[in-house]
């Protein structure tokens, strides 16, 4: 987490049986603290199997096995994201400060992950974004799986997700302020 404002404390939150994690930082802005929770939740694993499933010349048997393995992996990864979302929801509830919760959630707005973390917060895209915006650059650029959520005491001013190819995800840019 980079900030032009002083970072008072940082805590790393590691998830069991996962290489993913979240960072929690208390940032002092003027005379007020804001808790920033940056997340990287468990992947869908689609990219790991996509090459086998779509490669020309692969037999139907090999492709079918890859699809079956992908479905099993997606089920396991969804379970991991559920645990991660519950953990972050608990961190939000314990926070003595307004929160900004952001990052790669690897899940859609229809998911348990999205709704669990967003509960009681504002989705930056829904608040101040406009038009159609995706964050996952693959699978026909249909998916918004990276988010910025924030407490009611904060005010969104701008939100966008520029189409740049630094990653398989577009970055999310949100600008906001503390409400008067």
Regions found by a protein language model. Give the residues of each.
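Alpha-helix boundary/capping detector
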Residues: 28, 62-63, 143, 175
């Amino acid at each position: 987490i980079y900030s032009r404002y002083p970072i008072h404390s940082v805590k790393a939150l590691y998830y069991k049986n996962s290489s993913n994690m979240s960072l929690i930082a208390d940032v002092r802005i003027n005379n007020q603290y804001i808790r920033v929770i940056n997340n990287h939740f468990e992947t869908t694993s689609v990219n790991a199997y996509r090459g086998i499933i779509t490669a020309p010349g692969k037999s139907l048997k090999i492709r079918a096995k890859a699809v079956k393995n992908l479905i099993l992996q997606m089920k396991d990864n969804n379970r991991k994201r559920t645990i991660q979302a519950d953990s972050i929801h608990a961190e939000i509830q314990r926070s003595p400060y307004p929160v900004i919760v952001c990052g790669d959630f690897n899940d859609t707005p229809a998911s348990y992950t999205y709704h669990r973390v967003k509960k009681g917060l504002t989705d930056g895209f829904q608040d101040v974004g406009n038009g159609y915006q995706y964050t996952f650059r693959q699978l026909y650029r249909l998916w918004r799986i990276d988010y910025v959520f924030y407490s009611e005491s904060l005010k969104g001013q701008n939100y966008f997700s520029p189409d740049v190819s630094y990653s398989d995800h577009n970055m999310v840019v949100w600008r906001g302020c503390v409400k008067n």
